[in-house]
Amino acid sequence: MVGGVGYGSASSFKSATAGNINLKINVAGSSTTIFNANTSVAENKYYSVYMFDSTFNLKVSIFEDDRTPPPSGKANVRFLHLFVGGPAVDIVRAGGSTKLFTFRSYQDHVGNTALTAYTAIDPGPFSCAAVVSGTNFSVSQLPAFDASTGKSYTLVLRGFNNAVPLTPEYVKLVPVEDL
């Protein structure tokens, strides 16, 4: 059981017995269930569960994680587009034109698990931007964070197309350390 995970936050991996499990999500501090589904998990595997969209239109993405360490002297990043109503984007390294991920659309990883694969990067200060695909128009800029050697990160573009700026629901590109 995982509790107290607020909007935009993450928890560590939790163990589960292999086989069929029930995944239930309640509104924080209540017994009101907003998601309830059965899924199957395999022995000795890791899975990520992402919840997104609004409370009453909740979407959940569950996928198996590749826990292979990054290549020697590198860090790993992958990208999830969970920006409700957002355009297709490219993820571009700051200070250059290197595209790490191209033409990524809302929830595209759901039908294509290859889109949850990691890309190796040099460790150290890491910054990038989500830009409308094929343009330089910035949707969101990720402030620099320290990508550590041997660690893996998921870059999540989240938020709502019509959210008020500076609110938690406004579009934001955030790093999640995959523990």
Predicted feature locations:
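Intrinsically disordered, low-complexity polar regions and short flexible loop motifs
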Residues: 1-179
